[in-house]
């Protein structure tokens, strides 16, 4: 809406993405901080508590903590984006569609867990099906609007090959399949990581900050040309959505830091992972995402290795998976695990940002 003040009334300051992103940050932060206590109070009254695993004794004290806090920061982000974003931009509309759909799937899963008072939730097949369908819709729209299908290796100037060249019945199946995989992997990896107070929140903020920088450069003719970065027309507006989400996450972290007063639930973690994947795809950073989201990669790999090892060797690699539970079983304090993982995420994203210049 603020963009319309520039478009129709010539208020030039609202033409700047950076200014509107700053406004979006504080609006989303304010909404998240203000409404979260009301949500916590309502959730406690409704007994919308996170079912706690009986396998981790240290989590016994978390049993009455409400979940689904992701709904608040997602709505805060959407409101700020609607206020500050250019609603005629296809990437903005697709980004809002992406985060909304994944949040709804996560909310349904949370509701089923709360109703059943266990961690089962939606069946794995149904959850995968819904995530797959939404991912397929989003990636199909990206192809329809002509998004760049080049495959880039981090720190390299030129693409390795064009995924769009591999077609079946005039459909770029390689690009489509690869992007769907990125969506599914990232959304589930963030979901797995969300097991300690604030553990998924700060790495998500770091990832969104880095991806905001990449998307801004991609959408800026001057910067993309100077840095030899692949230009993506109109993508710069996504910075407003990303920065709004960062602001909303800081507001959530105010209540989610140890000891947490609220958990984000699947409604938050699935939506977060999906939006991070979306930003990575738009900025052509699907491979660099392995570094940008290194904590999510480590957490997901620990589960894959644990399950695979037990299935084929009948032996466990870790005391418990995901790996943050392994460290808990080893006697690490929760705060120590969280802060050390945050440090790893910050350092990894600093290295990732170097790829803007080192190409």
UniProtKB/Swiss-Prot annotation:
Q: Does the keyword Cell inner membrane apply?
A: yes
Reactions listed under catalytic activity: UDP-N-acetyl-alpha-D-muramoyl-L-alanyl-gamma-D-glutamyl-meso-2,6-diaminopimeloyl-D-alanyl-D-alanine + di-trans,octa-cis-undecaprenyl phosphate = di-trans,octa-cis-undecaprenyl diphospho-N-acetyl-alpha-D-muramoyl-L-alanyl-D-glutamyl-meso-2,6-diaminopimeloyl-D-alanyl-D-alanine + UMP
Q: Which GO terms describe its cellular component?
A: plasma membrane
Q: What's its EC?
A: 2.7.8.13
Q: Name one GO molecular function term.
A: UDP-N-acetylmuramoyl-L-alanyl-D-glutamyl-meso-2,6-diaminopimelyl-D-alanyl-D-alanine:undecaprenyl-phosphate transferase activity
Q: Which residues form a coiled coil?
A: none
Q: What cofactors does the UniProt entry give for this protein?
A: Mg(2+)
Q: Which GO terms describe its biological process?
A: cell division; cell wall organization; peptidoglycan biosynthetic process; regulation of cell shape
Q: What is its main location?
A: membrane
Please state where this protein is localized.
Cell inner membrane
Q: How does it sit in the membrane?
A: Multi-pass membrane protein
Pathway given for this chain reads: Cell wall biogenesis; peptidoglycan biosynthesis
Question: Its biological function?
Answer: Catalyzes the initial step of the lipid cycle reactions in the biosynthesis of the cell wall peptidoglycan: transfers peptidoglycan precursor phospho-MurNAc-pentapeptide from UDP-MurNAc-pentapeptide onto the lipid carrier undecaprenyl phosphate, yielding undecaprenyl-pyrophosphoryl-MurNAc-pentapeptide, known as lipid I.
Q: Which family does it belong to?
A: Belongs to the glycosyltransferase 4 family. MraY subfamily.
What is the name of this protein? Phospho-N-acetylmuramoyl-pentapeptide-transferase
Question: Could you tell me which species this protein originates from?
Answer: Helicobacter hepaticus (strain ATCC 51449 / 3B1)
């Amino acid at each position: 809406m603020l963009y319309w003040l520039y478009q129709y009334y010539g208020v030039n300051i609202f033409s700047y993405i950076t200014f509107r992103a700053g406004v979006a940050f504080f609006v989303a932060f304010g909404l998240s901080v203000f409404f979260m206590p009301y949500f916590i109070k309502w959730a406690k009254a409704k007994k919308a508590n996170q079912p706690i695993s009986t396998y981790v004794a240290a989590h016994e004290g978390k049993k009455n903590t409400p979940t689904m806090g992701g709904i608040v920061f997602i709505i805060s982000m959407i409101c700020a984006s609607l206020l500050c974003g250019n609603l005629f931009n296809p990437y903005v509309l697709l980004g809002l569609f992406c985060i909304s759909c994944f949040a709804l799937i996560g909310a349904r899963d949370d509701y089923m867990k709360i109703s059943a008072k266990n961690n089962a939730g939606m069946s794995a097949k149904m959850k995968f099906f819904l995530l797959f369908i939404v991912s397929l819709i989003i990636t199909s729209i990206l192809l329809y609007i002509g998004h760049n299908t080049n495959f880039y290796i981090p720190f390299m100037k030129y693409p390795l090959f064009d995924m769009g060249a591999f077609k079946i019945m005039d459909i770029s199946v390689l690009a489509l399949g690869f992007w769907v995989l990125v969506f599914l992997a990232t959304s589930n990896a963030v979901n797995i990581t969300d097991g300690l107070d604030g553990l998924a929140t700060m790495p998500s903020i770091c990832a969104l900050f880095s991806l905001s920088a990449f998307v801004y450069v991609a959408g800026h003719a001057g910067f993309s040309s100077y840095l030899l970065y692949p230009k993506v027309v109109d993508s710069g507006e996504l910075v407003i959505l990303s920065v709004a989400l960062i602001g909303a996450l800081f507001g959530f972290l105010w209540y989610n830091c140890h000891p947490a007063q609220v958990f984000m639930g699947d409604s938050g973690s699935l939506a977060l992972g999906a939006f991070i994947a979306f930003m990575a795809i738009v900025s052509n950073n699907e491979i660099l995402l392995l570094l940008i989201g290194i904590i999510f990669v480590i957490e997901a790999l620990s589960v894959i290795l644990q399950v695979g090892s037990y299935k084929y060797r009948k032996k466990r690699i870790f005391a418990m998976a995901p790996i943050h539970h392994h460290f808990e079983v080893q006697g690490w304090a929760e705060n120590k695990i969280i802060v050390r993982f945050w440090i790893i995420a910050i350092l990894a994203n600093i290295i990732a940002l170097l790829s803007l210049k080192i190409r």
